[in-house]
A protein has these predicted regions:
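Intrinsically disordered, low-complexity regions enriched for glutamine and histidine
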Residues: 4-6, 64, 112, 144
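Short, charged low-complexity linker/loop segments at the C-terminal edge of domains
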Residues: 151-160
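Context-gated lysine
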Residues: 2-4, 22, 34, 46, ...
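Second-shell loop/turn segments in exported
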Residues: 8-20, 34-44, 85-98, 102-105
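A well-ordered secondary-structure block
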Residues: 73-152
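Short, well-ordered surface patches within globular domains
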Residues: 13-75, 121-127, 131
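Ser/Thr/Gly/Pro-rich low-complexity, disordered linker/stalk segments of secreted
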Residues: 1-13, 160-165
Length: 165
């Protein structure tokens, strides 16, 4: 008999759980915008894809940064120049009492720069990416990414994850 394997308590059971967490972050972001009298963001498939690339890059490299693993700026993940980015590395121990979406939104809302991105009326669309990884200290964590694009902006391509140089 093989021993039973049990997932980590903080790990989502499947992709549907991760998708639900991403949607919860989008919903919470739009609730914050509504509280501030700002129009809701629409979800962009291309921004969702790009945000996931950014989260995956950080999870693969273990480096939490607005600079991509190959040294390029975060906005090179798409062909749009009008992208804003919020990132957070959320260690598993921080998720003991509250959900990932609630915890990361609290952290972003407590930071003036992150809050400014979430409440910027110039932005019209959002994408969210989440990836499980380890941080620079070897701690299990989630890399959380929000990407924002100006109203009327467009993306024709999304880059592949960049490798460390």
């Amino acid at each position: 008999d093989k021993p039973e394997s049990h997932p980590e308590p903080t790990a989502p059971a499947n992709d549907a759980d991760v998708d639900a967490m991403k949607q919860d972050i989008i919903d919470r972001t739009n609730a914050l915008r509504k509280e501030n009298g700002i129009a809701a963001l629409t979800t962009s498939d291309k921004l969702m894809q790009a945000a996931q690339v950014r989260a995956d890059e950080m999870a693969a490299s273990g480096v939490y940064s607005h600079i991509r693993p190959d040294g390029r700026k975060y906005m090179t993940v798409t062909d749009s120049q009008y992208i804003g980015e919020n990132i957070h590395c959320l260690e598993d121990w921080a998720l003991k009492e509250k959900s990932l979406p609630e915890t990361v939104m609290w952290a972003w809302s407590a930071s003036a720069g992150h809050l400014k991105n979430m409440t910027n009326s110039r932005y019209g669309s959002i994408g969210v990416g989440l990836a499980k990884g380890t941080d620079e200290n070897g701690e299990d964590c989630w890399y959380c990414v929000q990407l924002f694009m100006d109203t009327g902006g467009s993306i024709s391509w999304v880059d592949r994850p960049a490798a460390k140089q």
